[in-house]
């Protein structure tokens, strides 16, 4: 359970300075009308609910350390990408949850941020293969002309957001 994981991390390391919520499962590539409740639940439970539960359980530790939360969301909800209804719904929920947490937890010194990386991941590779025209259109709208590199681009942003420089 989430409570046990967070408690174990706090006991093992003596504190929790940073919480990064990045896990997400979904049935990308499935149109809205073809989604089942199980498909939708997969995205909501693995993304939005997981983020909520980890944030809730980690808050006492983060409050004590004046730590940081970095939640991963996506442009999928912002831009309405085909075949990503449940994924987009979960990620938009995470963005809203994060905004509320930033307002509520900021006075306690806890920094809450959202990263919407559009990084080249296995899930995005699948989407690229299933929607090549949409992929090409998306690339044209990115100033660098490419998706982010998970380590070089996204990882460095997370390191900064977890640092005192971002507070």
Regions found by a protein language model. Give the residues of each.
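Substrate-binding pocket helix/loop in short-chain dehydrogenase/reductase
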Residues: 2, 30-32, 36-41, 138
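C-terminal substrate-recognition "lid" of short-chain dehydrogenase/reductases
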Residues: 13, 61, 147-167
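Active-site loop-to-helix junction immediately N-terminal to the catalytic Tyr of the SDR YXXXK motif
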Residues: 35, 80-88, 100
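Active-site helix of classical SDR
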Residues: 55, 90, 98
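Alpha-helical segment proximal to the catalytic Tyr-Lys
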Residues: 60, 103-107, 167
């Amino acid at each position: 359970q989430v409570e046990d994981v967070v408690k174990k991390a706090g006991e093992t390391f003596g504190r929790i300075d940073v919480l990064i919520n990045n896990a997400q499962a979904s049935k990308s590539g499935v149109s809205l009308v073809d989604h089942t409740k199980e498909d939708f639940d997969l995205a909501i439970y693995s993304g939005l609910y997981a983020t909520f539960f980890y944030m809730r359980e980690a808050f006492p530790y983060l409050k004590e350390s004046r730590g940081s939360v970095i939640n991963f969301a996506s442009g999928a909800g912002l831009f309405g990408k085909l075949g990503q209804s449940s994924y987009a719904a979960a990620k938009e929920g995470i963005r809203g949850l994060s905004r509320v947490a930033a307002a509520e937890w900021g006075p306690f010194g806890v920094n809450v941020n959202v990263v919407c990386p559009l990084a080249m991941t296995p899930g995005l590779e699948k989407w690229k293969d299933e929607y090549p025209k949409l992929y090409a259109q998306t690339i044209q709208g990115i100033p660098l002309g490419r998706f982010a590199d998970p380590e070089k681009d996204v990882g460095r942003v997370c390191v900064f957001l977890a640092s005192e420089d971002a507070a």
